[in-house]
C-alpha cells in the first residue's frame, strides 16, 4: 500500500529525495548527491511529508522503506 501510494503521488524527483531520506541522508547530503540546492531538498521533503501524511522525516522514511520492502 505505501509503495503504491508513493508511486502514485510523488514526483520522480520526490522519489529520488525520498529514497535518500529513507537511507538516513541529511538535506545537505541529498542535495550533493542529486546536484540540487539544499532549499530545493527542503521543499521536496515538505512535499513528501504532506503527500504521504507523515508528521516528520522519520515517519516519511518508514513509509518509504516499508514500500520498498514489499517489492
Model feature map: region roles:
Residues 1-19:
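Regulatory hinge/linker segments at domain boundaries
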Residues 4, 50-71:
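Basic, Lys/Arg-enriched C-terminal extension of HTH/homeodomain DNA-binding domains
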Amino acid at each position: 500500500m505505501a509503495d503504491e501510494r508513493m508511486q502514485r503521488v510523488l514526483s520522480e524527483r520526490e522519489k529520488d529525495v525520498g529514497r535518500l531520506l529513507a537511507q538516513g541522508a541529511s538535506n545537505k547530503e541529498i542535495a550533493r548527491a542529486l546536484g540540487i540546492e539544499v532549499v530545493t531538498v527542503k521543499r521536496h521533503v515538505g512535499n513528501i511529508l504532506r503527500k504521504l501524511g507523515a508528521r516528520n522525516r522519520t515517519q516519511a522514511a518508514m513509509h518509504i522503506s516499508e514500500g520498498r520492502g514489499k517489492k
